Amino acid sequence: MLAIDKDSQKFFLLTRKSPLSVTAEYPCTTGQATGDKAREGDLKTPEGVYFIEGKIEGGLDYDLYGDLAFPLNFPNPVDRIRGKTGGGIWVHGRGKAFTPRETRGCVALSLPDLKSIQTTLAPGTPVVIAKHLSVNGAPARDIPIEKELHRELRQWARDWELRSERFFGHYEQEAFTKAQGTPFEAFRQRKERIFASQPWLQVFVGHVGVLAGPDYWVTCFDQLYRSPALISSGRKRLYWQKNADGQWRIVGREFAPGNADLLPDYMEAKRQEVGELLEKWRQAWKSADLSAYLAFYEPSARQDNRQGLEAIAEHKEHVWGKNPPADVFIERPTVELNDKGLEVRFLQTYAAQNGYSDKGVKTMVLEPRGASWAIVSESWEPLS
């Protein structure tokens, strides 16, 4: 993370751990005019939360830029809401000596200093620019806000995967329209078409960061999206402001597709969910609780050569009526991705009250159903 203090003309490289700590500090130079950038050509450096978008290493005026520059995402969504204009704001080198406040709006530091940290300046690196800032960690008053926004983000993701009308309530429609440059209604209609066309969605977020800007906050996070038709990942940023009722609402967003490396975290979370589901399923079977047992299955589920809940119920009533279960054991479960959701395999040992027992490999396919999973197919192979 980078931070620029315009008053002191200082550039900080920060480690985003708790507490925030300064890794390196360098002199820099910013815009010739003081104040926050408002329009193209005003020679001011913008103030807010920005992110590195790329890297330029050639074709530059060496005296002005050296041979290295990192473009920022100015104007960001909140800047557009506020009517700010302009662009071409970079963090760049300087091929000659510089004095304070001599750029046309960019942030410049000596070329050797910039090159010494360039390996840390990947796309998506946060850059906080302020008239004056404290680099001694987040103020205590900000911690509750960060927790609030973590909760808001988790609920937003949950409402998205539930395809709920509540998903759209997380947005401030007028501001979002200005920020994105397209009507909110178009965004809504596109999402509703997807909701209607897919039997399920999964939205998993991780590696969440929360940053404070001038009268707005940014949550930045890795996102993994799954549906029967698509699996994608990337880095997303949501811009939040409070509405007139004091509720946090999303006013803008940015997304960079790519490998967010969230699949291992997603699979670990799903293994935990499946483990909890299997234990409840096992207990329902062991106790011969037919209604609880059937609740784990999709109405059209297939169980070996039986199709549908009625056939499954008839079979279990027959077996349990003659010889109730004594215990069911599950060992070595594995969970893998499947086009319908997840495929689960485990070693199953069954014991009945009359002394009968068997052992085999069970395979289940689970499909997302609301906040949980439903069994859509189940098969069992005895051990030879």
Which residues fall in each region the model found?
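N-terminal post-signal-peptidase region of extra-cytosolic proteins
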Residues: 1, 25-41, 46-56, 71, ...
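Short, well-ordered alpha-helical segments enriched in acidic and aromatic residues
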Residues: 162-179, 284-300, 304, 310
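Short beta-strand edge/turn micro-motifs at domain boundaries
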Residues: 233-268, 343, 359-384
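Surface-exposed, charged secondary-structure patches
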Residues: 44, 189-237, 314-363
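Exported/periplasmic cell-wall-interacting domains
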Residues: 42-47, 56-154
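Intrinsically disordered, low-complexity
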Residues: 1-37, 126-148, 265-266
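Short, solvent-exposed aromatic-acidic interface loops
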Residues: 27-33, 91-94, 224-225, 251-263, ...
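Short, low-complexity N-terminal intrinsically disordered segments enriched in polar/charged residues
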Residues: 129-162, 254-287, 292-295
